[in-house]
UniProtKB/Swiss-Prot annotation:
Family of this protein: Belongs to the RdgC family.
Membrane-spanning ranges: none
Keyword line: Cytoplasm, DNA recombination
Protein name: Recombination-associated protein RdgC
Function recorded in the entry: May be involved in recombination.
Entry keyword annotation includes Cytoplasm: yes
Length: 306
């Protein structure tokens, strides 16, 4: 249930969108299996396998982005194309040109696609309409871009904005690493990455290792800055913070696992309980994280204008 990665975006808070309205927006872009000659197909699928494209409880929505892609290695295409080009050269008596080779490659791709295996990847999207968060559970930026692209295509207009904090995450992480502590109920854990801003980009990584203050100071004095830092929020959730404010390796700790509703009678009730618990905890953590990074600049601009 728990998201492993958090790609953060802002929506208006509150965002007056109902589950029914969201369902209508997504329906024209529902996932359909690709044809035998399509390399990739994307669309919205049911998060609960019940036909509904939107799962919603307590103003929290869950969407599911599905991508189907054919597995056709470039090495296979190139190998078959090369063999086909040799045959053509023997027939026509001269070397295949660039344009002809490109056409052969396209022909080979079309022939091999129907026999290629397909893989599906599902990516979850959490929308907090009460507090104005849209969060994509994706580690890779390219995947998050694909999800955002379909969101924009499905919801017009989509009032989506990035999260721009007042303080640079790199500067903040470097200071926390140097002092060995972070503010606001956050603690520094034992994983960190320090990278030099020089052209060479020398990098030092610590994994499961005590982050000694003297070692950190020595690296920072030579021009390195912290670009990844493992942290824990209120002894409840551990995660890794990155320069882009993407949050990775999100893990609920024992105190949250023990808070799961023991009275849930079936899978639906357990899902409701788990999703409510996850969104509540992550929502509070995100608010605290933005606060210790100086607040959201977008909110500050609006307050100043008012």
């Amino acid at each position: 249930m728990w998201f492993k990665n958090l790609q953060l975006h802002h929506l208006p808070a509150p965002w007056a969108v109902t589950p029914d309205q969201m369902e209508k927006w997504l329906a024209p872009h529902a996932f359909q299996p690709g044809s035998s000659v399509e390399m990739q197909r994307v669309g919205w699928a049911s998060p609960r396998d019940d036909g509904a494209l939107v799962y919603s409880i307590n103003r929290q929505m869950l969407l599911l982005f599905r991508a189907e892609k054919k597995l056709l290695p470039a090495s296979v295409v190139n190998q078959v194309t090369k063999a086909r080009a040799l045959e053509v050269e023997e027939q026509q008596g001269f070397k295949v040109g660039r344009k002809q080779l490109r056409e052969l490659k396209e022909q080979v791709t079309d022939e091999l696609l129907p026999r290629a295996f397909s893989i599906r990847r599902d990516t979850r999207v959490w929308i907090d309409t009460a507090n104005g968060w849209l969060v994509i559970d994706a580690a890779a930026q390219a995947l998050a871009d694909d999800v955002r692209s379909l969101l924009v295509k499905s919801i017009d207009p989509l009032p989506l904005a990035g999260v721009h904090v007042a303080r640079s995450p790199v500067a903040a992480m470097t200071d926390w690493l140097l002092s060995g502590e972070a503010p606001g109920g956050f603690t520094v854990d034992q994983d960190a990455e320090l990278r030099s801003s020089d052209q060479g980009g020398a990098t030092v990584r610590y994994v499961g290792h005590a982050l000694e203050a003297n070692d950190m100071r020595r690296h920072i004095e030579t021009g390195k800055q912290c670009t990844r830092l493992a942290m824990t929020w209120n002894d409840r959730i551990s995660f890794v913070l990155t320069p882009s404010l993407t949050i990775k390796r999100v893990t609920p700790l024992d105190v949250i696992k023990e808070a799961a509703d023991p009275t849930a009678q079936n899978d639906d009730e357990r899902f409701d309980s788990d999703f409510t618990l996850m969104t509540g905890e992550l929502g509070r953590m995100l608010t605290d994280l933005v606060d210790i990074l100086g607040g959201d600049r977008h909110d500050s601009i609006h307050q100043a204008a008012a």
